[in-house]
Amino acid sequence: MERSGGNGAGARAGAPSEGAAKGSSLLSAKSTEGATGRFSQSTPRPTGMDGFLKSDERQRLAKERREEREKCLAAREQQILEKQKRAKLQYEKQIEERWRKLEEQRQREDQKRAAVEEKRKQKLREEEERLEAMMRRSLERTQQLELKKKCSWAGSAASGPGGRDGESENTPPLPLTLAASIPPSDTGTATAAAESTNACDKLSTSTMNLPKQTEPPMSKHLSSSIVAISYSPDRALRSPLKSSYKSSPTRTTEKKKNTLLSGVGDAGKGAMTGGEPSQMEKVKKGRGATSVSSGGLGSPLRRCEPPENISKRSSSPVKSKVTAKTYPQSPKTVKPTYIGSPVKYYFPPTPSEETLKKKAEKEKSNKEKEGATGRQTTVLPREETLEKPMADKDATEKYVADKHATEKHSATGGKAEHSAGKSTAGTTDAGEAAKILAEKRRQARLQKEQEEQERLEKEEQERLEKEELKRKAEEERLRIEKQEEEKKQQEEEEKRKAEEKAKEKAEEELLSKEEQEKEKQEKEKKEKAMIEKQIQAEKEAAEAKAQDAAKQMRLEREQIMLQIEQERLERKKRIDEIMKRTRKSDASLEVKKEDPKVEIQPLPDVENKIKPVVPNKIEINVLNTCQKVNVSERAAPETFPQDIFSNGLKPVGGPVHPDVLDGKSNSLDDSTEEVQSMDVSPVSKEELISIPEFSPVSEMIPGMSLDQNGTGNARALQDILDFTGPPAFPKKSSENLSLDDCNKNLIEGFNSPGQETTLNTFC
């Protein structure tokens, strides 16, 4: 700002060099100074530069705002992604928790089911043990009873031995265990036992290839006993879930019973070495015992079988058929039945003569021995003789018994035979011992195979049970999933139905509201129309009433105006008469001297024209009168009150022809103004008296004289005072009153405001 001219020139000279050096950079400070020095020294920076700087600043700020917005958007997207991730994790966690709960619930149900099953099995085992104990007790009782019966039968059998020869031919041979346990008394019996064992060995190897149709003759005889065994209470109380080949607790008890009974049999056999009954007697007694025992097996706890029969209840082909018919199992619990090794059927050999002779000799020798040793025998030999028929009866049932029970019983029988062989030293030879050993080995091998088969079947059964449990669990899981899906679909369907119902309800409410609004609007329109009609009717009635009232008022006003006009005319007439009377005495002489010629326009047919509208027909030519008559100064006040009075009492417009009245009143006003503006010159009394008497009444009724009124001056003044009220000016004495003063008083009295207001009220 303090630069000199040289400095300014130097600055102006240096500006182009700086601009050339920096390439016309408008954003630098030096170029800005050169540009400003070029134009003016007082402005340091042009407005254009400020605009550029502002635009750069705006761009920078806009860029910063964009960057901040992008950062905010990126942060928001990151938050949204994190939220979605958390929601997904939460959802997965909820799903896992739900699956875990379902799995735990399924496990609990499985455990509960297994516990219930185990409890049921335990209860069944306890029930079986209880029933077995009851059966053992009942067996003991029945054995005691049978022993008593057989004791009585033994005496009768000894008296007639020959009658049973025919029956002995049809009796089957003894089984292997029974034949081995009975020591032969002589070589004949030993050979018979050897033959029977050989036959058993042959049959055991050949029965694998036997057809199913080939049944031994004994099967018919044993059908009744088999049916009775199949309906035994022990079999009826078994669980349907147990298969025929499973090892149940009953089999363990059967083994114990077999060992117990084998010991009893061994004791009996040891005591029988001295002498035993013949084979025919045993078969006969066995048949009798079989019939008795089979007859007592109808009810669950009737005559129970001996322990040998209980141990032989297993799944043979014949019994499986009977039980399948008797106890049909459900498809769920049916399991593959185990078909054991075929039963050894013993075909009875045809009796020959040699065997018959041997039997007869054997009977004789037995009788002799019985007679010798009859005294020495005690209760024990009797029990042995009673148990022999029981053993024979059991032998008949062993033909159709299960292989497993037969093997176990044969093993125990082998042990008993071995002990019996030891007790009866020298009763068996080496061949028979070898056969017995071979039979034992074969039975051990079969037992091992049976155990292996049972183990495999047990494993297979366990595997099947596991698969069944898995399948059930999978079905349960699928069922639960299906139920959940159906429940979810049902909830969605219910929700959708509820939404549809709500929507329909809202639409119905909206429609009802719209209908209500329409009805309301229509009702309001109707009410409004009715109100408008009522208002219109009332308005028309009011207008009619107003018109009637206005008409009535107009008529009344017309009547009043007519009355007022008549009164005014009468007053005017009286005033004129009064004025005439007051002037008459003084101006009678002057009037006689001067006979002024006043042109009075007569109004013909005044009587015809004065009807309801009288004031409109009055014509007062005051102006013409004033122009024609040269009045003096004294005469002007006398005529002025007449004009003022006529002007002040002009009628109100209305139905009484207001145009005519206005015209007349205007003419009167003009005349009044002209009268007031005239230069009144003083006149003499003669001239005043010579002014003709003028009044509207005299114009209307020219033939009427003032004296016809019949009223005096006093009465006229009294009437004026009554009408106009008391004067507003001080009353002057008659002594000091001149003619001029009288006229003045009259003018002031009639022009007072009280009079005009009174007159206006009438109008």
UniProtKB/Swiss-Prot annotation:
InterPro entries: MAP7_domain-containing, MAP7_fam. It comes from the Eukaryota. This is MAP7 domain-containing protein 2. Interacts (via N-terminus) with microtubules; facilitates microtubule stabilization. Interacts with kinesin-1 family members, KIF5A, KIF5B and KIF5C. Residues 1-72, 102-127, 140-531 are annotated as: Disordered. It holds the Pfam family MAP7. One of its GO terms (biological process) is axon development. The keyword Coiled coil applies. GO terms for molecular function: kinesin binding; microtubule binding. Residues 12-31, 312-321 have a biased composition (Low complexity). Belongs to the MAP7 family. Its main location: cytoplasm. Detected only in the brain and testis (at the protein level). Residues 184-212, 241-251 have a biased composition (Polar residues). Residues 434-575 form a coiled coil. Keywords: Cell projection, Coiled coil, Cytoplasm, Cytoskeleton. It is found in: Cytoplasm, Cytoskeleton, Microtubule organizing center, Centrosome; Cytoplasm, Cytoskeleton; Cell projection, Axon. Microtubule-stabilizing protein involved in the control of cell motility and neurite outgrowth. Acts as a critical cofactor for kinesin transport; in the proximal axon regulates kinesin-1 family members, KIF5A, KIF5B and KIF5C recruitment to microtubules and contributes to kinesin-1-mediated transport in the axons. Residues 53-72, 354-372, 381-420, 437-531 have a biased composition (Basic and acidic residues). Residues 1-11 have a biased composition (Gly residues). It comes from Rattus norvegicus. GO terms for cellular component: axon; centrosome; microtubule; microtubule cytoskeleton; midbody.
